[in-house]
Each structure stands twice: as structure tokens, then as C-alpha cells.
Design a protein with these regions (language model features):
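Conserved inter-motif catalytic segment of the P-loop NTP-binding fold
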Residues: 86-166
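The Walker A/P-loop phosphate-binding site
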Residues: 7-111
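Long, basic/Gly/Ser/Thr-rich N-terminal segments
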Residues: 1-6
Length: 169
């Protein structure tokens, strides 16, 4: 069962099967996830895993994430962030849950300028969603569908409040 494709409730029996299948063993080897994002030589992102950028309000988190996204779009270096994306995984999904479309567009243009790309037309590898007008539950469902239905996705950014991550818990 792939959680990303099937996040429905599971029975106790299914949970036991998944528990057994999820046990790690020192007698087995596991594939290392490709390292796709680095800063100062340290890995900050791998393909298929989750990373978080946390900090106080107004601490320039969005600016730093913009530099990371720009490096990924460029598939190179921006402000000491280095991205090395596989050729078949170049799509970036940026989801903003707090800002107005006007401010989201400013962030989107900044990302494109930082990557050295034109900021007067859409870029096929960047999809930017402005979801402030929706409820937290709707935002989650919209983001899920965008993730599940975007081919060749390499990087997903969710820029928003942490309480959104707790909806339904």
C-alpha cells in the first residue's frame, strides 16, 4: 500500500500487515534517497523525503525557501543553495496558504529572477498555488490532489501556518 496514493482509514488487520512490512532489519540493505538539495555542502533535501524550514514570524523563511526553489528551477546554485534534480523530476509545486494572490505573485517573480529566468511568463516547471481563500481542510485536499496529479514532481513547498498540518487530528 502506498500511503501517498491511498490515505484512507485502515483496519486493525491491515495495520498489523503494514506494521510487519515496515520493520527494518540490520540484515537488509536499503537504498539511499538521491540528495537533491544542499547548502554549504550539507544535505538539506533528498528525493522522496520531508524537510521543514521553521522559524519565528518575519525571520525570512519565505526568502530562504525562494532561494531553494530558484536553485531547483535552475538546477544549479542560488545563494549557496545547490540543487541537483534528476532529469525526469524537474517539476516544482509551491503552495502558499497565507498570502494573497498579489503577494504570491511577487514571491513567484522573485523566485524566477533569482533563478535567472524570465519573470514575465509562466515557467513549465513551477506551479504556484495561492490557497488563502480556502478553509484549512480545503487547502489540504487541493494540495493533495496537486501533488498526486502533477507528473515529474521533484519538490513540494508548503508555505503556511503549522496548525494546518494538524487538521483532522
Amino acid at each position: 500500500m502506498d500511503y501517498m496514493k491511498d490515505n484512507k482509514e485502515i483496519s486493525a488487520e491491515e495495520a498489523v500487515i503494514l506494521w510487519q512490512a515496515s520493520r527494518l532489519s540490520l540484515s537488509k540493505s536499503y537504498e539511499k534517497a538521491p540528495e537533491i538539495l544542499k547548502v554549504h555542502g550539507s544535505v538539506i533535501g533528498t528525493l522522496g523525503n520531508f524537510s521543514a524550514s521553521i522559524g519565528k514570524a518575519k525571520s525570512k523563511k519565505t526568502f530562504n525557501v525562494s532561494a531553494i526553489v530558484a536553485a531547483a528551477l535552475k538546477n544549479g546554485t542560488v545563494l549557496r543553495y545547490v540543487a541537483e534534480l534528476p532529469e525526469d523530476k524537474r517539476k516544482i509545486l509551491y503552495v502558499d496558504t497565507e498570502q494573497s494572490p498579489y503577494h504570491c505573485l511577487k514571491v513567484m517573480k522573485r523566485i524566477l529572477r533569482m533563478a535567472g529566468l524570465p519573470d514575465d511568463r509562466d515557467n513549465e516547471n513551477l506551479e504556484f498555488l495561492a490557497l488563502r481563500k480556502y478553509t484549512p481542510e480545503q487547502r489540504i485536499r487541493i494540495a493533495e490532489q496537486a501533488i498526486y496529479n502533477t507528473p515529474n514532481i521533484a519538490l513540494v513547498i508548503i508555505d503556511g501556518r503549522s496548525e494546518e498540518r494538524r487538521v483532522g487530528k
